């Protein structure tokens, strides 16, 4: 199971009750694979958004810190954040500008 999710993060959707280690391997490979994890820990959530900012859309009520990590990874992730603070907006714009 671990080898499968290390190769393809989405393989986690076929695993019942994956361990924390398997969850971690999945989101390290593909952050958006978090959508297949029921009640992921905050640590798993953070790894997911650091791997792919768009993973934030699969996190219920993300904290300001989680939102910040998402837009630092990909400024365009702001598109999927509900009511971002001014700080989050500013960091997102700076990140997008730095990509040009």
Q: Across the structure, where does each feature detected by a protein language model lie?
A:
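Alpha-helical scaffold segments
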Residues: 1-100
